[in-house]
From Swiss-Prot:
Location relative to the cell: Cell membrane
Residues that span the membrane, as ranges: 12-32, 44-64, 85-105, 117-137
Membrane topology recorded in Swiss-Prot or TrEMBL: Multi-pass membrane protein
Family, as annotated: Belongs to the bacterial AtpI family.
Keyword terms, alphabetized: Cell membrane, CF(0), Hydrogen ion transport, Ion transport, Membrane, Transmembrane, Transmembrane helix, Transport
Protein name: ATP synthase protein I
This protein's encoding gene: atpI
GO biological process, one term: proton transmembrane transport
NCBIfam families linked: MG406_fam
Chief subcellular location: membrane
Its biological purpose: A possible function for this protein is to guide the assembly of the membrane sector of the ATPase enzyme complex.
Length: 169
């Protein structure tokens, strides 16, 4: 498995909790007349497309990996270019899902920042926040995993050398 299930789960949960809290704050600001409903509509649209991008980026590599492990050596050699192209399509698909809300909002607003229905700033800010959540979650999980591996290596070294017995007595 390329992307650990824990990473998938934490990324989706944290981004969606962050999105819900952000939408609640935006609704509060809307009801106090600080911002318009355009921000809320744009945020909802962008959160949907950001979740699609997040799912594609986290789950599709695992699907590719499981399908690649079922191939024998000759098939892998002939399918290597296909998997390379599929990886490029996956990456460009994620970029496409970031751009879709901006294009929709731009088209509806007649290419102005704020229109009657949408505002373009949430379409830019939500994907950036998703990338930030993605980076922070992955850094924290990988850092924790590296520390656990180092502890296990140290314990294995102590057991192998007998140092742990000397320290106990």
């Amino acid at each position: 498995m390329i992307v650990d299930k824990k990473i998938i789960k934490y990324n989706l949960i944290i981004f969606n909790v962050f999105s819900i809290v952000g939408l609640i704050i935006l609704l509060g600001l809307t009801f106090t007349k600080i911002i318009g409903f355009q921000w809320v509509y744009s945020s909802l649209l962008t959160v949907v497309f950001s979740n699609i991008s997040l799912v594609i980026g986290l789950i599709l590599p695992n699907l590719l990996y499981t399908s690649a492990t079922k191939l024998n050596t000759q098939q892998v050699k002939s399918a290597r270019f296909g998997f390379f192209i599929l990886g490029i399509i996956t990456l460009s698909s994620r970029l496409f899902w970031y751009a879709v809300p901006i294009v929709i909002i731009g088209f509806v607003n007649q290419w102005q920042f704020q229109g009657a229905v949408f505002n373009v700033f949430p379409a830019i800010l939500w994907p950036l926040s998703m990338i930030a959540v993605h980076v922070v979650v992955n850094y924290l999980l990988l850092n924790k995993e590296i520390k656990e591996r180092n502890k296990l290596k140290e314990l294995n070294n102590n057991v192998a050398t007998g140092d742990s017995l000397h320290e106990a007595f």
